[in-house]
Amino acid sequence: MADDNRNFTLKIITPDRVFYEDEVSMVEFNTVEGEVGIYKDHIPMTMIVAPGILTITRGEEVKEAALHAGFTEVLPDKVTILAEIIEWPSEIDVSRAEDAKLRAEERLKEHDPGTDMNRAELALKRAVARIETVRQ
């Protein structure tokens, strides 16, 4: 790996396990304010994670996972993501994700006053993140 001194520690923790912990050169993911890419020596900050694809770059190696919700703490030499749910492509059931996508789309189309539209939109985003992660 070229220029190891440009790496930082990425740690991703879920309620069930340490999902990932290693030195990386960049991590990209969605926040409620848009997509971000983090390199070493980034200014310290905290962010709320939004559903989408998390991309981990380690030298020439790139890994992706479906990240659904959580919080991120960014320090100059370490990024910690506290994730409610995150899945590698091999852990995703595509047919289940496609079914969830269809259900969420139907709920959004119906405009039923009893439907929590924010919840339906989040369900749709999570399903799309799962599907796109597997198909990348």
Task: Outline where the language-model segments fall.
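Compact, glycine-rich, soluble single-domain proteins
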Residues: 11-103
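Short, charged, intrinsically disordered terminal tails
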Residues: 1-7
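Acidic/glycine-rich phosphate/pyrophosphate-binding loops and surrounding catalytic core
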Residues: 86-136
